[in-house]
C-alpha cells in the first residue's frame, strides 16, 4: 500500500481508499477515493504543497493561487494546506491569514475578505454560495453572513447597504455601510430631496411606533449626510 493511503469499507462492504498526511504533528485527512491510485496521487500532491513554497503559492494582493484544475487534491484542501504551511495554524475551512485580515476562498475565482475579528467564526463555519448570496449553517439553520453586520434578510445592496470601496467581496466591517436597518422601510430621492417611505400604520405598526420610526430614520439619515 502506498504511503499515506489506507483501505476502508462502506456499510455494504464496498472497498474505498482514504488518504491522509501528518505535518507538524498534525494528522490531516485528504479525503476518500474510489481507487488506490487517486488516493496515492493526492498524498503526493499534499507532500509537494507542504514542501514547495516556490511552486504552490497564494497571491494575497490579487487573490489568486497556483492551483491547477488538473490536480487531484480538492481546491479547499489546497488552501488549507498552504495556510498551514505559511502561517503554522491549521484551520478546517479554506482560509488564508494575512496581517490585518484574512481571505476566504470559495473557489479559484471567488474570494471574500474579512477582518481578523471574524476568524474564529469562519474557522468553524463553512460559507455556502447560492444565487449570489452567502450563507453559513448556524445551529441547523442557513443564516446569511450579512446578518453579522445588522443587515436584515432580503435587504438590497445599493438601497439598504453599500460596500464603500465598491468591492462586493470585501466584508471587512469598515467597508460596509448599513443605510437601512428597518423592515418595510425605504428611502428614495426626488428633486434633490430625500423622502422616507414608511410602512402603513394600519397594518405594519402602531401610530406611536410609526412616529418613533420616522424620528429614528430622520436622525440616521442626518448622520449619513454629515
Question: Which positions does each model-derived feature cover?
Answer:
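Boundary-flanking segments of nucleic-acid-binding domains in nuclear regulatory proteins
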Residues: 1-226
Amino acid at each position: 500500500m502506498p504511503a499515506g493511503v489506507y483501505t476502508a469499507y462502506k456499510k455494504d462492504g464496498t472497498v474505498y481508499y482514504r488518504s491522509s498526511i501528518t505535518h507538524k504533528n498534525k494528522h490531516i485527512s485528504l479525503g476518500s477515493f474510489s481507487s488506490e491510485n487517486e488516493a496515492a496521487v493526492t498524498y503526493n500532491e499534499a507532500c509537494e504543497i507542504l514542501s514547495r513554497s516556490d511552486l504552490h503559492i497564494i497571491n494575497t494582493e490579487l487573490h489568486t493561487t497556483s492551483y491547477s484544475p488538473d490536480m487531484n487534491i480538492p481546491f479547499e484542501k489546497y488552501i488549507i494546506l498552504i495556510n498551514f504551511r505559511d502561517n503554522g495554524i491549521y484551520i478546517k475551512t479554506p482560509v488564508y491569514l494575512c496581517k490585518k485580515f484574512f481571505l476566504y476562498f470559495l473557489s479559484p475565482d471567488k474570494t471574500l475578505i474579512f477582518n481578523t475579528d471574524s476568524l474564529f467564526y469562519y474557522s468553524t463555519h463553512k460559507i455556502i454560495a447560492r444565487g449570489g448570496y452567502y450563507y453559513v449553517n448556524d445551529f441547523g439553520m442557513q443564516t446569511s453572513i450579512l446578518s453579522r453586520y445588522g443587515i436584515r434578510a432580503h435587504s438590497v445592496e445599493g438601497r439598504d447597504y453599500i460596500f464603500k470601496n465598491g468591492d462586493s467581496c470585501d466584508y471587512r466591517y469598515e467597508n460596509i455601510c448599513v443605510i437601512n436597518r428597518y423592515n418595510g422601510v425605504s428611502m428614495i430621492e426626488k428633486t434633490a430631496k430625500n423622502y422616507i417611505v414608511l410602512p402603513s400604520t394600519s397594518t405594519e405598526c402602531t401610530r406611536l411606533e410609526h412616529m418613533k420610526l420616522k424620528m429614528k430614520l430622520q436622525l440616521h439619515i442626518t448622520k449619513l449626510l454629515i
